[in-house]
Amino acid sequence: MAAAKPHMNLAVIGHIDHGKSTTVGRILFETGVVQQHILDGYKKEAESKGKATFEFAWVMDSLKEERERGITIDIAHKKFETPKYNFTVVDCPGHRDFVKNMITGASQADAAIIVVSGTEGPMEQTKEHVFLSKTLGINQIIVAINKMDAVNYSEEKYNEAKDKMTKLIMSVGFKPAETPFIPISAFCGDNIKEASANTPWYKGPTLLAALDLFKMPDMPTDKPLRLPIQDVYTISGVGTVPVGRVETGILKKGQKISFMPANVTGEVKSIEMHHEEFPEALPGDNVGFNVRGIAKNDVRRGDVCGPIENPPTVAEEFTAQVVVLQHPSVLSVGYTPVFHCHTSQTACMFTELNKKLDPRSGQVKEENPAFLKAGDAAICTITPTRPLVIETAKELPQLGRFAVRDMGMTVAAGLVLSVKAKQMR
């Protein structure tokens, strides 16, 4: 059996009508995941509803209500293969709530395709998505300039959209020289799998070929062990078994570990994945591990396991770069929403608004602003209302990102810049 191809999570991001779902549907069709007869069924249904161009999008939007509205709501996971990688597509809705899923889900994307319409170019929302992608740790992107069929495959229109997107991604910190810009028509199939005769002026890779140019993200095995707990079980005859995903470092049998903020220690007796025992677990592995020396009630979801000599950091307070996505009024000092970070959900208070930033350049716009509103980016000091493990995004990005939830929506997202550690006795 050939060794499994490396796996990558791919986010597909874009403004609501720029053809994101259609692009994903087309990729799944061209890679053989979705067969023609299924598509024909979707096509008939789409035509009967007067949405003839939506058949590929319907592959992703398989929920009935979404189909009738023609927009993507929940994140759908679909898998496909290229010669080099196994991809899981995280079809990110052009709606606001995908941010929470992007940060806290297993859907932490390694790379992204940004779909922008050749007829309209980047929109305000495109900026926000690109900025967020960078904020959330996506470092590799492809820009797909879609709907080329609607502009008669005009090189001029392509260049117009490309120039605008070049400026936009540069302002956020992506390097245009390392970013493929590809003219496509997801609906007609141009430059998805085969080079299109309609764009003889374009000499670069097709979309599927460009996906194989992505570099595999580094496995953070050299970092200290950090394993956020999802659940804790008691198994008779075995004992206490915490379950979670290794984010960084290596979990080893026989290792002495500590759980924070619970502040308890134990020793790893055994490690299990898919009902098989393993001597160690690496980043990305979802494991159950039996720990000697702790009882079920000692540890809970949201705790983080680390080596006894380098335990996870419990924050007294932390400073973070925060982007406000949506808020019905304004956000000011004293605001205490719920922060979702790794598996933890903890109410935290904004105790200081230090600097307001220009979201496009990152430059300081205002010192100590009185409030923040939707669309603002800022550096803030935040105090958890109860002990919380959080690390700096620079050292351990997997534990340094968070989503801020309130009133049933994601109001903000951010990255931890520094942590003032709480002394644990």
Curated annotation (Swiss-Prot):
Localization (cell): Cytoplasm
Instruction: Please verify whether the record's keywords include Protein biosynthesis.
Output: yes
Q: Region G4: what ranges?
A: 146-149
Q: Which InterPro entries match?
A: EFTu-like_2, G_TR_CS, GTP-eEF1A_C, P-loop_NTPase, Small_GTP-bd, T_Tr_GTP-bd_dom, TRAFAC_GTPase_members, Transl_B-barrel_sf
Segments carrying the region annotation (G2) are 70-74
Q: Which UniProt keywords apply?
A: Cytoplasm, Elongation factor, GTP-binding, Hydrolase, Magnesium, Metal-binding, Nucleotide-binding, Protein biosynthesis
Q: What is its EC number?
A: 3.6.5.3
The UniProt annotation places Mg(2+) binding at: S21
Q: What is this protein called?
A: Elongation factor 1-alpha
Lineage, highest ranks first: Archaea, Methanobacteriati, Methanobacteriota, Stenosarchaea group, Methanomicrobia
